[in-house]
A protein has these predicted regions:
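The catalytic Nudix box helix
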Residues: 38-72
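Short aromatic/basic micro-patch
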Residues: 37, 82, 106-107
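Conserved N-terminal beta-strand and adjoining loop/helix that marks the start
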Residues: 1-22
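A conserved beta-turn-beta hairpin within the catalytic core of GNAT-like acetyltransferases
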Residues: 30-35
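NUDIX/MutT-family hydrolases
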Residues: 89-129
Length: 133
């Protein structure tokens, strides 16, 4: 009997600074290496999704954001694990971006998302982003 695949709950921020959103690039090595993503990470047990997204973004990028609302939730199954991703609209508040985990970042307008290579699970979030079309 196969072991059940681990399941992760992840919170990501769609971080707005006026009409631009922030995307970050994953390290080349490791899972989904070199792909772009929305910043965020795993939600801890008993942590609410807004606190998780603020904490993860602060840890990864050293910036402060204000979470506004949950805009989308998506389940995705990879070969060795599954994820539930909750996308939170956030507003950039303060701080200078430091790449503590990612290798690059860009502020882009939503239609430019299609110009970057994202993991399949993240692409499922695109349609819920304001101004994508």
């Amino acid at each position: 009997k196969k072991k059940p695949k681990p399941h992760y709950n992840v919170a990501v921020g769609i971080i707005w600074d006026e009409s631009k959103i922030l995307i970050t690039k994953r390290k080349e090595s490791g899972l989904l290496g070199g792909l772009w993503e929305f910043p965020g990470g795993k939600i801890k047990k008993k942590e609410n999704v807004f606190n998780a997204v603020k904490r993860e973004i602060k840890e990864e990028l050293s910036i402060n954001v204000m979470p506004k609302e949950l805009i989308h939730e998506v389940d995705h199954h990879y070969s060795h694990f599954s994820v539930t991703i909750r996308a939170i609209d956030c507003v950039y508040k303060s701080g200078k971006i430091e790449l503590n985990a990612a290798t690059d970042y860009k502020w882009i307008s939503p239609p430019q998302l299609y110009d970057f290579a994202f993991p399949k699970a993240s692409i499922k979030l695109f349609n819920s982003i304001k101004g994508i079309t």
